[in-house]
């Protein structure tokens, strides 16, 4: 498959490596031509993913028209910059041909839109899937066993996305609840801030356990109120992502 990764950060790069390892034709798009040229020449993402050699097959382009030649478009841009990237993509976007896989997490500042709402607002109705779960980019790039979930209202699309990424070290489950999966990836960050405060104050394990337990309960209730399935928050994109964010030194 021909896939373009829109974003040259750590997560986009790590997922590009997974896709290349699976035999796909992958191009990374980024906004800074000089940095893309450096990555292409040195085969390392020195800003965001140090110490990991990039595969020779991975291609780079600063030209959105070239990136849009792929049928699969993976949005791996930080949420607050994603709208600008979508605006660049819009002139080339063909909803009958393209499918969008989003891996960014969060809520848009100011509008409070979820990422799927932002994408449909800019690009219009499209084939959309979100990929989320407990997955540090550094570990994925080093082929540490990882499990995530692909979610779409079109379960067959979610299965297609799962097949794109699935290999011996990267397991992808499927879900028909993109709202719940997206909200899990966003809401856990609020709980993670509180977990960091507990660590900083050296309060011990008891309050953190209470925080995580009550935090996932609140995430489930809010997620249900916003249209998600409460059961989704007991999965990889809910409690899984919450645990890895609140307990890891990476965060």
Feature-to-residue mapping (PLM):
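NAD(P)+-binding Rossmann beta1-loop-alpha1 motif at the extreme N-terminus of oxidoreductases
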Residues: 1-52, 61-62, 88
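Rossmann-like NAD(P)(H) cofactor-binding subdomain of soluble oxidoreductases
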Residues: 54, 60-145, 161
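Alpha-helix C-terminal capping/helix-to-coil transition sites in glycosyltransferase folds
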Residues: 68-69, 187, 239
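Internal alpha-helical scaffold of NAD(P)-dependent oxidoreductase catalytic cores
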Residues: 81, 92, 118, 122-127, ...
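C-terminal substrate-binding/catalytic lobe of Rossmann-fold NAD(P)-dependent oxidoreductases
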Residues: 227-251
């Amino acid at each position: 498959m021909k896939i373009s990764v829109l974003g040259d950060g750590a997560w986009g790069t790590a997922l590009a490596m997974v896709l290349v390892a699976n035999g796909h034709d992958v191009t990374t798009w980024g906004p800074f031509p000089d940095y893309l040229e450096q990555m292409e020449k040195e085969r390392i993402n020195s800003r965001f993913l140090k110490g990991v050699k990039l595969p020779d097959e991975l291609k780079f382009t600063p030209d959105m028209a070239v990136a849009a030649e792929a049928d699969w478009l993976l949005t791996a841009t930080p949420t607050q910059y994603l709208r600008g990237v979508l605006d660049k993509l819009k002139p080339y976007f063909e909803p009958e041909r393209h499918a969008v896989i989003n891996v960014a997490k969060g809520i848009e500042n100011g509008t409070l839109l979820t990422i799927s709402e932002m994408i449909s607002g800019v690009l219009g109705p499209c084939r959309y899937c979100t990929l989320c779960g407990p997955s540090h980019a550094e570990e994925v790039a080093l082929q540490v066993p990882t499990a995530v979930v692909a979610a779409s209202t079109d379960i067959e699309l979610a299965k297609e996305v799962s097949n794109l990424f699935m290999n011996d070290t990267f397991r992808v489950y499927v879900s028909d609840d993109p709202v719940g999966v997206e909200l899990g990836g966003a809401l856990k960050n609020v709980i993670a801030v509180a977990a960091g405060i507990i660590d900083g104050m050296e309060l011990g394990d008891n309050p953190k356990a209470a925080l995580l337990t009550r935090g996932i309960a609140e995430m489930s209730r809010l997620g249900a109120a916003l249209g998600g399935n409460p059961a989704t928050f007991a999965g990889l994109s809910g409690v899984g992502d919450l645990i890895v964010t609140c307990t890891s030194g990476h965060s």
